[in-house]
């Protein structure tokens, strides 16, 4: 399996190189040169498998030709999911006759990011050991990616990891899950700015060729294709449980950076009959506006009770745009560069309508989100975190008639105690292993929204660990 850049000016790569590079040299995102497709019989053969084995079989086609054989991958997925809190790893819960919640929060940091990142951390170890190399991972987080990435990479011998988070713009639980990790190879940076500022600085570090080479930069944000590959299996597992490939399904996902719903779309590229992809947004509604009216204009980031979606620039949308443009890399590059410069994405009506055929969207403000949390609990007894509640509302608003819809539950409600208390008057408890989270000492450094300042911090950190 080889990968190409969405912007067309970088050489094609095999999976191992894509894993370690994260972002293509031309600023584009890697995508498979051709999509692997399973036959209906091959999909049916995966029904009923333990999740770790299903995950390995779904991911395997993306990793051919490198250091990771199938037996290696299966050992990695088994180790990755052994510590999850639920035997099914990703259980389905039925809320309504045709509405099913896919719980993705049973991992070590209580968020869907664990499912891909626990695998990615071990993939890094495997490939770097085979090459006798070391990398510095830099990433930006709006809340959940940071803690999941740190948990996946802490104390690994060949990886240093530096994570930027927007100071004061995550929940306290999200912040503490990052900053209370004490490991020599972990650096937490609290940035004065928004998530988009953090993400821009990460992209700028990758664009700084001497810095990128000096520190051997890599990424575990969803710009890294390994993250997307690690998220496809749970949508496949849910679809198979509901009758696919012999029955169509729909998927609803609370969406910030567009990676999770892109993984569901990738599952369809692989042959699963997923009929509609439903985007749930908060007041930062750029994706919902685009889907409704071809209006993708950035605005100031609004702080909400669903902070993981407090994003204006959804990096993974570039991968879908590349496909919608018929894999026209120069046009993709032009569109993305213009979007970055002007704050407005301009696509033709034909391209917009091609996206609209598959995608729908709904945006909820904070009041509607809190009301939806209360409604879900009153009607079903289910306690959904703010992001999940938005996804459920989107599912109910836009699901195709007669088609079961899978709503992704992306985080445990205990990660957002203040919002949950406002909505339903309770603060859901953390699992026992996190009982002392509020008593643990925090470890982080503050930085201004300055590339030079952040690069200095990361360089000092990485070189200290090289010594």
Question: Which sequence ranges carry the predicted segments?
Answer:
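PLP-dependent amino-acid enzyme catalytic core
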Residues: 1-467
